[in-house]
Amino acid sequence: MADNEILQSTAVDAANEYDASEIQVLEGLEAVRKRPGMYIGSTSTSGLHHLVYEIVDNAIDEALAGYCSEISVTINEGNTITVVDNGRGIPVDIQAQTGKPALEVVYTVLHAGGKFGGGGYKVSGGLHGVGASVVNALSEWLVVQVHRDGKIHEMKFARGHVTEPMTIVGTTDHTGTTVTFKPDPEMFEETVYSYDILHTRMREEAFLNAGLRITIADERLASAEKPEEERRHSMCYEGGIREFVTYLNRTKTPLHDQVIYVAGQKGDSMAEIAMQYNDGYNETTLSFANNVHTPEGGMHEEGFRRALTTVLNNYGRKIKMLKDDEKVSGEDCREGLTCVISVKLTDAQFEGQTKAKLGNSEIRTLVNNIVADKLDTFLEENPQVGRMILDKALTANRAREAAKKARESIRRKTALGGAAMPDKLRDCNENNPELTELYIVEGDSAGGSATQGRDSRFQAILPLWGKMLNVEKARADKVYGNDKLQPVITALGAGIGDEFDDAKLRYHKIIIMADADVDGAHIRTLLLTFFFRFMRPLIEQGYVYSAVPPLYKLTRGKTTRVAFSDEERDAVSAELRGGNPNTKIDISRFKGLGEMNPHELWETTMDPEKRTLRRITLDDAVQADETFTILMGEKVEPRKEFIEKRAQYAVNLDY
């Protein structure tokens, strides 16, 4: 879609003029380049993509105010980004405090924007002006075009400074803003954008803003050969968060067809909740405040959870599924729940610049009241759905009680909760978890070699054996009772599920060391599924790693080398031949970790000075949840489609 198609005419409410008087200056821009992490979280790929979110958030602020219906995001050749909206256009008249055009103030002064006085925006997630100036400060160059008042105004910047003052470059009958920028390679570890990451975020924004159309396109030459559906998406969801829940549950089996939707408003604050139960055991709750994802929850989630538990307990007693002295816990009520909570409020109090948690206590009361009132009405009007939900909560309650008994049984066996460790654990001498590593090793043979080859001062070894439980298909009671997972739980010492306590964690590096074959990949996946579902903070805090053992052993005479890929094998082979193609090189493929002697295992896979570790990260919880459900869940067809689509990317697999 061409830019001028996005920049459609938009009527402006004369009673709520958006001009330079709405732009207030609070402080300067100097600190951004010195401490970028304070403003965008990090200078890794996460921070790189955050630049795009900041500009898009500003466009969505226009949508929230009722002035924008279309946004486009384009990844251009050279990994520059263009964001176009058909809002009112950033003000270009003179801002009174500075005597400069408001456009210049917005892009060069931190905390200069239309959010702070309450006139420009009643609801804002992007803090219009904060994100704009930060993106400018961290860009090698940035160009803004504003279509407003019949004219096209253009201004150019570099690393936070004006390089070309605002000029009029044409006329227009549209309104809106076009921003193009190039991330500064001096500031970022990586400057290549991921279409998939941006597409996922833009899809989320489209779900949260019913009727807003967001288009994303990848125009890089390297992407030209990809099919259209992999490099261009246009998204508009009239059903809003109801469609979001349907999307999240598409790989699961819903218990009821209808997505439950409740909404309400008090003053300038409003909340909407969409929810649907599935036959799984895991909760997926996504919460947002002014379109900003709050992964650590906050008051809106507290209000929802409190009301949900109260409503289901009261309803259960009313229909005699619960006795007067019986109750189901909040955890029981949320088993198999997929829920999206979206609140809009005038003065959102986020914890931290990255806005991970919402702190407004008044929104807890609003959400609680909406759910308490309207969910109760829904259950009364839909008794069949109500009974299905209660039945699932009761089943979860029984499983939780069974898990509690299993835990207590384990504690009794370990000297009333003492520190008795698994028999197979070969612990280290160091007690400080910040300095210790736990290698979870596939097989007793490799476990023996690892034990002999390790540095026992700080490296602990736990061998795994036999078939491991797929926790995607199991409740907590089965997990606690599983003889393959119990040693892992006990060795780590932090508990699982709602009882997980990272203060009790015994190791801050948990390294999965499995064979470089299909079986090894399966074991890694089973362990990661377990960590994701029952010990997610381990992944969120960056404690989980995958070891990278060598694939090949190359020998020439008394010289032995190893290679970690086919490419490295060929390079090492050529090096050992020394330009003589007739030199004999013995090349063997390691079939498993157990083939390596203790010295080889230490030298290649365990020595902190030489080894390669891959940290397991969680950038997108929704995508991770979906992937684990597809790969490890009950449904075969989604798994088949997933594998077929990605088969071309499979490497280093032995069949």
Describe each model-derived feature in a short phrase.
Residues 34-53:
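Conserved short strand/loop->alpha-helix "switch" segment adjacent to the catalytic nucleotide/phosphoryl-transfer site
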Residues 61-62, 89-90, 518-519:
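Residues immediately C-terminal
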Residues 90-113:
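Short conserved segment of the HATPase_c
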Residues 398-417, 432-437, 448, 452-454, ...:
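C-terminal interaction appendages of subunits in large macromolecular complexes
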